[in-house]
Amino acid sequence: MKKQTAITNYHVAFAQSIGKQRDHNEDSIFINSGLTCDHTGGKPFGLFIVADGMGGYVAGEAASAAAVRAVSVSIFRSVLVPYIKDTIKESQISLHEAMEKSIKDAQSEVITSAPGGGTTIITALILNSQVTLAHIGDSRAYFIGHDGSIVYLTKDHS
């Protein structure tokens, strides 16, 4: 479920497609990237979430939206707000525990908000040059190198 990789800079892009077999999209996406700067330099951060709903039109859409909301709120409260406020140091934050809790929060929210629905989810949290991933299901994370090489960073859960 979790993996850490060091990065020096990143570019973010996204696209959505319903494909050729469906008439609607059940995905939800959250992108937040920022930089705090002071006399000591900049501190980059980012939170990126993709959830792929399943279970039919309404249930899948509701499940993916609920999961994205729950994960983003959980990570902002436990990690990003203290990081931005500089009230705790990065080394004091248990990123793995925070990510795991956010996924559990998403599960609870989906059960409550989207009966009959479900979702896969991939979350990437970037603090300084460290990226921490958490995922459930077959939503994937890739590293695309400057040379165009592609490395899978996650392994699908079945």
Task: List each model region and its residues.
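PP2C/PPM-type serine/threonine phosphatase catalytic domain
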Residues: M1-S158
